[in-house]
Amino acid sequence: MSDKTKGRKEEVVTREYTINLHKRLHSCTFKKKAPTAIKEIRKFAQKAMGTKDVRVDVKLNKQIWSRGIRSVPRRVRVRIARKRNDDEDAKEELYSLVTVAEIPAKGLKGLGTKIIEDED
């Protein structure tokens, strides 16, 4: 059984998630909302993908900071890809890349986790 679970975390996979930032930043000070949101996204990706090395895309960072430090979006749709580290002397074998996913016109309601087939 331990071999199965270990193999699961070793796969290269891409998934789409909706992260509710509102509940994660509820008790946060105004002037710390955007930096804390980035930290919470990193924490979410670590837990979801099982990797310690999480890289946040520049576009996602811009989207979080687009309305300023204190008016963070309530929810954000992200695409998290677990990838192999090509660098030989890297500490971790895998890393997670978090990017912005396109939001449908009808909104974020009812969207669950979606596994994306590799386009490569």
Curated annotation (Swiss-Prot):
Protein family per UniProt: Belongs to the eukaryotic ribosomal protein eL31 family.
The superkingdom of the source organism is: Eukaryota
- Write the protein's name: Large ribosomal subunit protein eL31
Q: Does the keyword Nucleotide-binding apply?
A: no
Keywords, A to Z, come to: Ribonucleoprotein, Ribosomal protein
- Give the encoding gene's name: RPL31
Q: Which GO terms describe its cellular component?
A: cytosolic large ribosomal subunit
Q: Name one GO biological process term.
A: cytoplasmic translation
The record's NCBIfam families line, in alphabetical order, gives: PRK01192.1-1
The species this protein belongs to is Nicotiana glutinosa (Tobacco)
User: What does the record give under GO molecular function?
Assistant: structural constituent of ribosome
Q: Which CDD domains match?
A: Ribosomal_L31e
Q: Which Pfam families match?
A: Ribosomal_L31e
